[in-house]
Amino acid sequence: MSAHYATEPAPTASATLHTTFGPLHIALFAKQTPLTCRNFLQHCMDNYYAGTIFHRVVPDFIIQGGDPTGTGSGGTSIYEYPEFEYDPDARDPNEKVVLRDEIHSRLRFNRRGLVGMAKSEDGSYGSQFFITLANTERELNGQCTLFGRLEGDSLYNMLKIAEAERIEGTERPVYPVKITSCEVGDLGPFVDKVKKRQVVATGPKTEEKPAAKKKKKAKPGKALLSFGGDDEEDEDMPIRPAKPKFNPMLVTDTKLPEKESSTKGEASQTRKRPRSPSPKRQPQPSAPPKNRPKTPEPTKQLPLPNPESPERSPSPPPKQSFLSRTNAEIENLKASMRRTAHAPAAETKPKSALEAMIPQTAIRGRKRPPPGSVSASTSAPNGITGFSSNSAEAEALKMFNAFRAKLESSDSQPTAAAAKRLSVAKTDAAEERKETPDEDEESQLCDLHFIANCQSCKSWDNDVEGGANNGADDDVNDSGWLNHQLRFGKDTLGKDLNWKREHQDVDTLMVIDPREKEKELADSSRPGTKRVKGRGLERDRERERKKGRVGDLEWSKR
């Protein structure tokens, strides 16, 4: 990005377009493109773009707007107005200003967020502009004028506009983004040239019908003096008769001459009729009265209805549509296919209000009579036996004494029958081992660990190890396990300090110092020293003595 700023010139003017998706801050290259920037700034100053939309969205290319008509074919430049046709600061003040291409070598469409002027088919520019969404050097360089760039967070608002949903097959968005207002920031070199005008963006022209002119009432004609040359004109003009000089309401009805009556009839058409008493209207024949139902008199007896006469229905039955009739037939068919025979419901006794409050998952408990009651040892009507606290304590004490007597009478050693059975089982197993030959290793492998003669997978209740099933009852009845005591071997490894405290004279560890052994060997190898006899024997005797105290098993572990 720094390389772009190194090649691009610094912007000298700025403007902001406020849209429904957020503001678009545009920095303008007014020094490199003066005509285009002045056109854009003047439109922003006049609020020309307010109400316009972004009518064209091409993904990964451009978004286009600035057309007051919203069709892509409208919009004009300021140089088409008389006040901007001539520029007094130009080289030739008498030459009309035309908005043409302003191509600059340092302004290139090489990234997104660059603002350019949209060109019409005839090559002229108006008010429409576009914003690039990607690198468009191949399509737009040297073709259109680049006059600005977006700055700040406006890039994110531009991307939101570019994500708009479009009408299928076109480049027009379904819900186009609208420019709500315009704001001019820095005018740069156009401080004294760009001023606000009262110009509003014009939309598409609609043909208005001319308003119909109201017809004016003809004024009464005035009598004009007739001259020789005006005879023909006087014949065409109607002569208005003079107003009668009497009140017709006070004068009796007399016959007027025919000429006077004709003129009077013509005058009545051109002026208002005088007020006259309205003639009396003749009474029109009254319409026959409708047959309205009379309220029956309370004292009059009504006739009984004739059962043979057909009765009229109050309203015709509504006609069912074809769909409703079809659905009704389907429902009837489904109902006929269902099983209509129902199992007879079991008769249930009515529950009282208290029983209805008991949940269905509740378990009926044991009824206990109050302590000291007479019915403690009797049974309840529902079969549950009640008991008192005294009888329950006596029964529990009796069972406890029987169990304690059983413990005292039992022996920890197995009974003679069990010992005999165990010896017989061992002899039988030994005979079977001698008789049955060894099978292949593959047949002796366990299915879980694939180990020959696996003890983990071997059945613990095998007849060979546990004895025959014939003496199973004796094992169940054997009570020698009741007095069995759990005993552990001597802890000579130091896990339990009690054994060390009791046998402090036993040295469980034998320390051999190699330095002492080295000294002994060195002394014995010297020529002038006498070799002490019996020292090795004493060491061996001491080792045997310790070995006897500890035990052969523990000594082998060391």
Curated annotation (Swiss-Prot):
Start-end of Polar residues biased regions: 374-388
EC number annotated for this UniProt entry: 5.2.1.8
Gene Ontology CC terms: catalytic step 2 spliceosome; cytoplasm
Residue intervals of the PPIase cyclophilin-type domain: 11-184
Biased composition (Basic and acidic residues): 513-523, 535-558
Compositional bias of kind Pro residues: 276-290, 304-319
GO molecular function, one term: peptidyl-prolyl cis-trans isomerase activity
Gene Ontology terms describing biological process: mRNA processing; protein folding; RNA splicing
Annotated catalysed reactions: [protein]-peptidylproline (omega=180) = [protein]-peptidylproline (omega=0)
InterPro entries: Cyclophilin-like_dom_sf (IPR029000), Cyclophilin-type_PPIase_CS (IPR020892), Cyclophilin-type_PPIase_dom (IPR002130), Cyclophilin_A-like (IPR044666)
Disulfide bonds: none
Principal subcellular localization: cytoplasm
Subcellular localization: Cytoplasm; Nucleus
Enzyme class, first EC level, given as a word: isomerase
Record flagged with keyword NADP: no
Keywords linked to the UniProt accession: Cytoplasm, Isomerase, mRNA processing, mRNA splicing, Nucleus, Rotamase, Spliceosome
Disordered, as annotated region: 201-388, 408-443, 510-558
Function: PPIases accelerate the folding of proteins. It catalyzes the cis-trans isomerization of proline imidic peptide bonds in oligopeptides. Involved in pre-mRNA splicing.
Family per record: Belongs to the cyclophilin-type PPIase family. CWC27 subfamily.
UniProt subunit comment: Associated with the spliceosome.
Protein name in UniProt: Peptidyl-prolyl isomerase cwc27
